[in-house]
Amino acid sequence: MRTVVWQSLSETQQDAILERPAITEGANITAAVAEVIAKVRAEGDAALFELTEKFDRVKPESIRVTEQEIEEASARLTAKMKQALEQAYANIAKFHNAQKPTPIKVETQPGVVCEQVTRPIQKVGLYIPGGSAPLPSTVLMLGVPAQIAGCRKVVLCSPPPIADEILYVAKLCNIDEVYNVGGGQAVAAMAYGTESVTKVDKIFGPGNAYVTEAKRQVSNDFRGAAIDMPAGPSEVLVIADETADADFIAADLLSQAEHGPDSQVVLVTPSVLIADQVTDAVQKQLKQLSRASIAEKALASSLIIIADSLTQAVSISNYYGPEHLIVQTKNPRELLPLLDNAGSIFLGDWSPESAGDYASGTNHVLPTYGYTRTYSSLGLADFSKRMTIQELSAEGLKTLAPTVVTMAEAEGLDAHKRAVTIRVEKLNARG
């Protein structure tokens, strides 16, 4: 880990060290994904079978996973695993249930009533990556809010063979359909539909560069589907003072670094002693990790920043806008009102990032790459949409009419003006 003293850097150097690595999909990925999307749109299920065999080296018997297969997968899980998944489900459901919006109804002036109501997005698609380890936690983070929001149809795609844990959580979340499809072809299938795969309105979930690019392409096509948020490498920033536990900090940094070689890991502290202790602790703990080689690559570009105060540490964090922000200080909650840009914040010694990743109740689908300045963590609102309503009485319209007419005249929109005056004239004619 590289250590720098913030005050010794010029403004240009400060900008440079906090710059994320460029996300370069490359023309080859863009073209390859466009080809996959076109093939799925043209050939439907046949393309899905062909591409699954090509990319995943698996020949599924069917696109859709059967109820029997889901039940058999559930039966294979240990009681311990089921209990863990059910506890996580309960906590996530409790937190997301609390996010249910309250309808708004306001009389802005006599006879003019404005309302706001929320409706679920009708059909949503969840993408769960494959790979060496299953990700049932991601199914929970996507499936629970979709269920609570009341989405009419929820489907899930994952590369075959789909892990038992994923199928069990799909059952917990009452997901309607599960498909043996991964990669860009899964995104295309959900965005445009095939004989077996339901076309959805919005697609959620992480994935590799091909999945990310497929999501981008379908979201830019009005015939495609909306997506949850832009994606980038995972990241953590830790703010720590001299009271922090260096071993805890090292463990938190490494838990992020093991995600992938492009993970971003940053410690900001006014304590040189803590910086040195964390450097030593990281090296000791690194040797014990099964994914040490991956974590080591991420650490090669990681940073320890020596700030001159906690106030400056907060400013650095707000400027960087991390996906995960851990605050290990004497009074972490005192800093909370000053923290503006973060996907999820973990306060105090006993709040490791892992808790939020799996089971505390918050959502682990978070904006990265500095998007925390404008994007929020995934929540119930992402599976819903707002509608406004207005209802005017006859007297309400008459009272509001002069304002609307004056503004319509200023904008040169005669038909807008006439839509009001024609009504007022009829009201006046009635006497």
Swiss-Prot record:
It catalyses: L-histidinol + 2 NAD(+) + H2O = L-histidine + 2 NADH + 3 H(+). Binds 1 zinc ion per subunit. NAD(+) binds at residues 127, 185, 208. Disulfide bonds: none annotated. Its cofactor is Zn(2+). It comes from the Bacteria. The keyword NAD applies. SUPFAM superfamilies: ALDH-like. Pathway: Amino-acid biosynthesis; L-histidine biosynthesis; L-histidine from 5-phospho-alpha-D-ribose 1-diphosphate: step 9/9. One of its GO terms (cellular component) is cytosol. Zn(2+) binds at residues 256, 259, 357, 416. Keywords: Amino-acid biosynthesis, Histidine biosynthesis, Metal-binding, NAD, Oxidoreductase, Zinc. Substrate binds at residues 234, 256, 259, 324, 357, 411, 416. Belongs to the histidinol dehydrogenase family. HAMAP family: HisD. Catalyzes the sequential NAD-dependent oxidations of L-histidinol to L-histidinaldehyde and then to L-histidine. PANTHER family: HISTIDINE BIOSYNTHESIS TRIFUNCTIONAL PROTEIN (PTHR21256:SF2), HISTIDINOL DEHYDROGENASE HDH (PTHR21256). This is Histidinol dehydrogenase. It comes from Vibrio vulnificus (strain CMCP6). The gene is hisD.
